[in-house]
Amino acid sequence: MTVLSREARSALDEAIQEARRKAEQGARNALLVLGVDEERKPGYLTAEQAEIRRQLRTECRRLGSFDDLVRSVAYERWHRMLFARFLAENSLLIHPEFRVPVTLDECEEIAREEGRDLWEVAGDYAAEMLPGLFRRDSPVTRVRFAAEDTMALRSILARIPSETFLAEDALGWTYQFWQTDAKREVNASERKVEGYDICAVTQLFTEPYMVQFLLQNTLGAWWLHLHPDSPLRNEWRYYREGVQHDFSAWPESPAELKILDPCCGSGHFLVAAFHMLLAMRREVGEETEAAIRGILTENLHGLELDPRCIQIATFSIALEAWKAGFPTDSYLPVPNL
């Protein structure tokens, strides 16, 4: 399992916090231009902008406040960019018509030809791959940032090294880092923690070695109980010999196993369990595509209060599924989260 070094994680933390501040400022600027905070529609809006404004005001009422809308637009804007780069760096951003991987440079060329924004194109391509994850019909994804605000976000994204996007735990850490400022502000205020603040204050995700230790000594121990000579034992560095387990209530095959993470966060445990289950299913002769399909539909389940965590966990698992060899031209089941 490839994980971020302490230095790389610290650099990512800094970049994500800066991105949130820039994205929220850019979102606020764009929403003010549209007059979303005003009762009367500005006279300079086009018919298309006026319709987007109407939808955004409806979304604002649903979310509860203008600041909530700012946060929502900022989150969607940055994370569509971030997810697209994760896909591109892993050669998994697929052109929907030609079914071949495209780079961000190629997306930019396509965007120029179509008179669109690079990240709009890249986000649409990503949405084609996981239509259940990216909300293309949401008005928050149609907000156009000013050029200088877009460039600020692109600059931050470009500073993140390519190696970061190849680490299996990188995507999971991004949301905890996204919440850092909000958590700090709530803790400093000493106000009652409720509503939106609950997610910001209570999310603290598990270190990779803890995840590996817990899974290798439960899921791994079960597998070695069934298959004492399994070569997978050599891959589990945290497995402890000689510990007594009672697996009498456990199933006899991976297909019957169900794993539920009741506080799944951004998917650290589920991603690690995915890789262990894939190795187990392959060991008993399953083909990669069938094994992955089975893991997503039969094995992995997760619960989480924060829908943004669910989005990131879903994307994390999907990304690992594609990296493991699931065909990008086949329908990938959405995990049970």
Question: Predicted segments — roles?
Answer:
Residues 1-278, 299, 303-312, 335:
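Preference for the N-terminal adenyl/adenosyl cofactor-binding alpha/beta module
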Residues 70-71, 248, 289, 325-327:
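Catalytic micro-motifs at enzyme active sites that drive phosphoryl/nucleotidyl and oxygen chemistry
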Residues 230-231, 288, 328-330:
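Short, charged/polar low-complexity linear motifs in solvent-exposed/disordered segments
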Residues 279-284:
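Post-Walker A helix-loop "phosphate-sensing" segment adjacent to the P-loop in P-loop NTPases
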Residues 295-296, 332:
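Short, solvent-exposed loop/turn segments at the edges of secondary structure
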Residues 315, 319:
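Conserved adenine-binding aromatic site and its adjacent loop/helix in ATP-hydrolyzing domains
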Residues 320-337:
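S-adenosyl-L-methionine
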